[in-house]
Design a protein with these regions (language model features):
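Short, well-ordered beta-strand elements
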Residues: 14-29, 47-52, 141-145
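Bacterial N-terminal signal peptides
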Residues: 1-6
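Short, polar/charged alpha-helical segment
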Residues: 28-47, 162
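Pocket-flanking alpha-helical
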Residues: 34, 52-92, 185
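A conserved helix-loop-strand patch within extracytoplasmic ligand-binding domains
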Residues: 92-145
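Sec/Tat signal peptide C-region and signal peptidase I cleavage site
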Residues: 7-13
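Extracytoplasmic/secreted envelope proteins and their assembly/folding machinery
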Residues: 31, 35-38, 60, 81, ...
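Ligand-binding pocket segment of bilobal, Venus flytrap-like solute-binding proteins
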Residues: 61-62, 69-73, 145-187
Length: 187
């Protein structure tokens, strides 16, 4: 699930906000939340906000090792769960909101119509039918669309692809290339 977190202890004792850096992640909802936080913190609290580009893995690594950015308003924490728990327990980071987007989830999805028409009820059922999901460049293979480079879900999905031996079962990875490419692949 998504998590919002930042470094602990950023506000000064007199309540003055000062300067903060906020990660502006490379997907639409995170861009929106970062810009909304910027408006609220600048207009409502007099903060000086700098938005810096980010993605889950790179932003977390930078926050963990360098303390920058100060805030990641939407981060897919499941991709960094173990090191995040360690950083929180060592008071380097604090989770401020465990679910900024209620009901958000991460997983592999297929459309309901294809599932129903082909009696696909389990992951094994789907993996056994690459013919239903043709690869855009090689119709003899099933196309398994992964997350863009730099996203934690790309690493997890590629490892699961290997673990389930999907390549041996007629599948080939489709690199979505970007957030927009991933959005465009959804029919």
């Amino acid at each position: 699930s998504a998590a919002v977190f930042g470094l602990a202890g950023q506000a000064s004792a007199d309540g003055h906000c000062g300067s903060l850096t906020i990660a502006e992640m490379n997907w639409a909802s995170a861009e929106f939340i970062a810009n909304l936080d910027k408006i609220v913190l600048e207009s409502g609290f007099g903060c000086e906000i700098e938005l810096i580009p980010g993605a889950t893995m790179t932003t977390f690594a930078s926050m963990d090792s360098k303390g920058v950015p100060d805030v990641a308003p939407e981060l897919w924490a499941n991709a960094v769960q173990t090191p995040l728990k360690k950083a929180v327990s060592e008071n380097r980071m604090a989770v401020l909101n465990t679910a900024p987007i209620t009901g958000a989830g991460e997983g592999w999805m297929i459309d309901a119509k294809t599932a129903k028409e082909n009696n696909l009820k389990t992951l094994a059922d789907v993996i056994a039918r690459p013919d239903l999901f043709p690869h855009p460049e090689d119709a003899s293979k099933g196309g398994f669309v992964t997350c863009p480079a730099g996203w934690g879900c790309q690493i997890a999905s590629n490892n699961l692809f290997k673990g389930f031996k999907m390549g041996d079962k007629g599948w080939k990875i489709v690199d979505s290339g970007s957030s927009a490419g991933l959005d465009g692949s959804i029919e």
